[in-house]
Amino acid sequence: MRIMARIGVENSLTDVQQALKQQGHEVVTLNSEQDAQGCDCCVVTGQDSNMMGIADASIKGSVITAHGLTTDEVCQQVESRT
């Protein structure tokens, strides 16, 4: 059985949060930089290229920018990076 990832998702991306939960991932809402710690990757809107400092080294995993992507495309990005 595959271990599911801990994914930080910006709070405005509720459709992405729901889809990732349905896939079995642990979803953490990103309200501050501290929320990103311990996440395998983070999904941000991309409206602010450095949302709360997450684009810097505050997380060990990938930062996925959801701008221009469908919910399914974001989920595929998460799967390929975790």
Curated annotation (Swiss-Prot):
Q: Which domain of life is it from?
A: Bacteria
Transmembrane ranges, per UniProt, are none
Return the InterPro entries for the record: UPF0180
Cysteine pairings via disulfide bonds: none
**Family (UniProt):** Belongs to the UPF0180 family.
What the entry lists under HAMAP family is as follows: UPF0180 (MF_00506)
Protein's name in the database: UPF0180 protein BCE33L1278
